[in-house]
Swiss-Prot record:
Record's signal peptide: none
Pathway(s): Purine metabolism; XMP biosynthesis via de novo pathway; XMP from IMP: step 1/1
One MF term in the entry's GO annotations: metal ion binding
CDD domains cross-referenced by the UniProt entry: CBS_pair_IMPDH, IMPDH
UniProt name for this protein: Inosine-5'-monophosphate dehydrogenase
Keyword Repressor: no
A GO biological process held by the record: GTP biosynthetic process
Keywords: CBS domain, GMP biosynthesis, Metal-binding, NAD, Oxidoreductase, Potassium, Purine biosynthesis, Repeat
Amino acid sequence: MSNQTYRDSEYLDGLSGEELFNLQIGLTYRDFLVLPGFIDFHPSEVELETRLTRNIKLKRPFISSPMDTVTESQMAIAQALMGGIGIIHYNNTIEEQVALVEKVKRFENGFITDPVILGPKNVIRDLDAIKERKGFTGIPVTEDGTRNSKLIGIVTNRDIDFEKNREITLDKVMTTNLITGKEGITLQDANEIIKKSKIGKLPIVDSQGKLVSLVSRSDLKKNKEFPDASKDERKRLRCGAAVSTLLESRDRVAALYEAGVDVIIIDSAQGNSNYQIEMIQFIKKEFKNLDIVAGNVVTRAQAENLIRAGADGLRIGMGPGSICITQDTMAVGRAQATAIYQTAKHSAKYDVPVIADGGISNIGDIANSLAIGASTCMMGFMFAGTTEAPGEYFYENGIRLKKYRGMASIEAMKAGGDKRYFNEGQKVKVAQGVSGSVVDRGSILNFIPYLSQGLRLSFQDMGYKSIPEIHKALRDGKLRFERRSESAQAQGSVHGLYSFSAPTMRAE
């Protein structure tokens, strides 16, 4: 038998991308499969590096959505550490959004830069409440109870365990003879001080004795290097922020720029508007080195207008999200896979990457979106149940859940989300989203490696080692697809079992 392997035109099955998406019917991720290619490499050889915009590269094609139940500073930090990026939502004041961005930009791995702090006149009962809510003690005490004031003590369990009167003020019980580290200390040196001194927390102070950050003994085992972290030229974590198209958002952009934001997402359900074009032009004129992702768009004409205005990246999707009802309510939008293919093909002429935004519920959806032209995937549903997402967990029927709501839900619009839908100031609100809950997914620091490994395995099955390779094969017609009938979709999922358990992730 011949050792020859067949990869090219002689034995092509299925359809090219052009043939698949010229069928004059809207397709979603479940409506097609990528046909397998030839494997001559290990999954570890697959590179997931990609571009967010013309100028910003990421080591992982994952972006957390600018939703108030998905991305604040904790999520953005975790995403950047793992090679992606988080986009801070704008259902807040300018000052609040800027503060969230600043937390990301000043983050140093292993240093707690926004520790819980109390003042000298707080009482032991306040510490009890923190322990119950957060699960830890060892709280720094500063002169006025804020981060940028002089450190005067620390309160630990040893100080308060046997104190019956929980109304005693902390200045009466706190430890004042403190071991501290000086601002600029390395994490390695800080850890050595903790080990030698046998203390639980090491406060880091500046030259004036003001609290800068905290290093915790409990984090010693958790701290690890993040070689794929998304960092700017000054080695700070990358972070994005969303703004609306309203005139008042120009002040928001200016403040975010001063805070060091890396990319602005102009957040609009229908991005093809004079409001968005004017916002793009304003940003490009005033902040020339600030990248812009415009959108949302689903057609080539929409993409053309925003690219001509100066967009560095495009966000694709109108109505595919799990909490979005735009297509049902407004009768406007487009099937997500078709939208990605058509806009990505057009945007590639200008070297503008596109983001697949919405409708992603598993690794297969991520792989499909990248295979048809997207460079990155923006996710809300997938990340909403993680530890780093805003909000507290709650239980329902024994299942651990977190709240997740669309930014066009009535609940979110009351908090300011209607700016995205040209609906601000209107007495009658028309919802284009819903509120719900999602199951606990654990930490982003464990979930992203799971998604990454699954994506590498998918790329291996396709026969390609990188996102640029797949995009080239798509353009050349070598990446082949097949439409799926309803019965094919049913057969490709779990079927015929009385019951089953389907764990999807296991860490060795």
